[in-house]
């Protein structure tokens, strides 16, 4: 009996080796360890991890990654940093980050920190351990500012997604359309008191002042906030026509969405509030999501675009594997793309040596779900608003009812991706 079990075990072991066999010695190839230190409390982290696992599964199904003539599988290792949970100190998140680096010894990192404050603090850790990182969540422009202080030290760090200034730029240009086409010119800003949201809201405020908007309010709330009624009341009393909102913590965003609906605030909601932009928003929030506008960064995070087939292909595969679409309208496609960018760099480097891998990553030119992926001198992905063949791109969509009365997300900006025009609610029409 024992001999039978031993023989069967050897058979299964041999079968598992066949795909990743090293031609010169006949042994199973060691896996490429891909580390994911992020906050799994947030949907950005949990759905991003699903996207990474999907990409790794696809790559391994095709034989793995060619490393200097050897086909090697990818293996994902995860550390929940809890960095996105309100009240969790940056230090605690860093300890989880470092534990993954020292114990799991990844060859590279994808996704990375959720909270921008954790990203900035973790840059020194990544540099210390010389592990190439493709960050795909944290949005603070402080990343490139820190990078410029010592490009040699921080050369292992890359941002393979947008930052707050890119996101805000798309919303700013949407506000320009609202002002030009409908004469709207009164706005109240609400933002989460965190690094990335400050950058987003600050740019939006500056743009509005420069383009003639009247500011009804500029309201900051702690990331653990659970009552937004003072700001919403201010919007009503000040007759704001638009609320520019930026938030990412699940609890607060959900509370805001419900209070906005319950208080019947007569202002158009524009910005980034995940529950309002999620594919399941009509069920989770209700029919009052109609007319709200969200920037999805980058494209392909949750919404399939008719003019960018790769977005639909990724989301179809995601839904087939997990039985649902990703929920947060941001960065899921970046997480997916990052694995392929990493695999391509490894193959071009012909090595897992971190310095050679950095050189290969710097030369990245990859056509991904999120658009064309190239990095600039600050190791951040280049974005634009004109063509996914030239740069990474985002999209602004609005919830509208189709001819059957069903709420759909309609791309309205940029023009080359638009599938409809912005619609004002009846109570705003003059």
Model-derived features: positions:
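Stable alpha-helical elements in mature extracytoplasmic
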Residues: 44, 48-55, 89-97, 118-122, ...
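Beta-alpha junction/loop-to-helix N-cap segments that form part of ligand/metal-binding clefts
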Residues: 44-50, 65-148, 160, 221-228, ...
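Segments of small-molecule ligand-sensing domains
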Residues: 318-332, 343-410
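Extracytoplasmic ligand/sensor domains, especially the bilobed periplasmic-binding protein
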Residues: 106-218, 268-294
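Extracellular/periplasmic periplasmic-binding protein-like sensory domains
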Residues: 164, 257-336, 347, 409-419, ...
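Signal peptide-proximal N-terminal region
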Residues: 29-32, 51-78, 211-212
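Extracytoplasmic "Venus flytrap"
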Residues: 35-53, 79-86, 90, 115, ...
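Short, low-complexity disordered leader/linker segments with a strong preference
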Residues: 1-33, 101-102, 128, 427-430
């Amino acid at each position: 009996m024992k001999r039978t079990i031993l023989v069967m075990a050897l058979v299964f072991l041999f079968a598992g080796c066949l795909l990743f066999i090293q031609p010169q010695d006949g042994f199973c190839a060691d896996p490429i360890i891909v580390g994911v230190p992020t906050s799994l409390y947030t949907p950005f982290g949990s759905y991003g991890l699903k996207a990474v696992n999907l990409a790794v599964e696809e790559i391994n199904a095709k034989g793995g990654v060619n490393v200097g003539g050897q086909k090697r599988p990818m293996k994902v290792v995860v550390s929940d940093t809890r960095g996105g949970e309100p009240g969790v100190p940056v230090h605690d998140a860093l300890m989880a980050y470092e534990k993954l680096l020292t114990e799991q010894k990844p060859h590279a990192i994808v996704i990375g920190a959720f909270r921008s404050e954790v990203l900035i603090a973790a840059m020194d850790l990544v540099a210390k351990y010389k592990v190439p990182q493709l960050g795909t969540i944290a949005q603070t422009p402080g990343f490139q500012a820190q990078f410029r202080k010592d490009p040699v030290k921080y050369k292992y760090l890359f941002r393979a997604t947008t930052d707050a200034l890119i996101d805000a730029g798309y919303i700013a240009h949407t506000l320009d359309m609202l002002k030009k086409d409908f004469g709207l010119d009164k706005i109240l800003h609400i933002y989460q008191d965190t690094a990335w949201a400050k950058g987003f809201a600050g740019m939006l405020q500056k743009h509005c002042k420069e383009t003639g908007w009247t500011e009804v309010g500029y309201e900051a709330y702690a990331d653990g906030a659970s009552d937004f009624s003072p700001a919403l009341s201010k919007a009503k009393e000040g007759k704001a026509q638009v609320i520019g909102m930026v938030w990412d913590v699940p609890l607060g965003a959900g509370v805001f969405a419900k209070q906005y609906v319950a208080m019947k605030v007569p202002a158009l909601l524009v910005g980034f509030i995940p529950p309002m932009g999620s594919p399941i928003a009509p069920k989770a929030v209700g029919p009052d999501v109609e007319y709200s506008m969200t920037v999805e960064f980058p494209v392909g995070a949750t919404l399939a675009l008719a003019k960018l087939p790769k977005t639909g292909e990724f989301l179809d595969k995601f839904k087939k594997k997990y039985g649902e679409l990703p929920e947060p309208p941001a960065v899921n496609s970046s997480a997916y793309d990052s694995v392929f960018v990493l695999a391509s760099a490894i193959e071009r480097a012909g090595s897992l040596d971190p310095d050679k891998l950095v050189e290969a990553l710097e030369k990245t030119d990859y056509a991904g779900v999120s658009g064309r992926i190239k990095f600039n001198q600050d190791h951040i992905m280049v974005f634009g608003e004109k063509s996914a063949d030239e740069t990474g791109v985002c999209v602004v969509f609005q919830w509208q009812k189709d001819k059957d009365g069903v709420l759909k997300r309609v791309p309205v900006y940029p023009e080359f991706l638009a599938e409809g025009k912005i619609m004002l609610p009846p109570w705003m029409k003059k």
